[in-house]
Amino acid sequence: MQYYQIWCNLRDSHRDLEFCENVRAYLGHLKDAGKIEGFTITRRKFGFGPSELGEFNITISTRDMEQLDAAFSMVAPREGRLEELHRAVYSMVTDFRSGLYRDFPDPERVGASKP
């Protein structure tokens, strides 16, 4: 599995529930289209964690890089309903950070045992 990690803060923290609804609508659309396997939304608790990573963490799961690339290709035109859903999320965000992680050891690693 590949995990696209997003950390962010909200421009207006009073709109936290609206933000989560918007993320669910946007990423749910990608999941329904088979472009991602799933996602989670988590929020820092009691302020614990590095401030540079932001209060919210969104983890987007894909089978492999091919599926992740297909998701990015679907979003890239930035038009239509998908862009409306995307805009509803990114317009609420500040301090965006992202990273790409994988299960490890992964199947491509020589000498890795299978689970």
What residues fall within each predicted segment?
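Short amphipathic alpha-helical segments
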Residues: 14-41
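Active-site-flanking beta-strand signature of metal-NTP-handling nucleotidyl enzymes
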Residues: 2-9
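An amphipathic, aromatic/His-enriched active-site/gating alpha helix that lines ligand/cofactor pockets
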Residues: 29-37, 51-55, 59-100
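Short, solvent-exposed loop/turn elements at beta->coil junctions and helix N-caps
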Residues: 42-48
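Structural beta->alpha junctions
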Residues: 10-13, 64
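Acidic/histidine-enriched, glycine/proline-rich intrinsically disordered or flexible terminal extensions
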Residues: 95-115
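Short intrinsically disordered coil segments
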Residues: 21, 73-77, 113-115
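Short, flexible turn/loop "capping" segments at secondary-structure junctions
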Residues: 1-2, 49-52
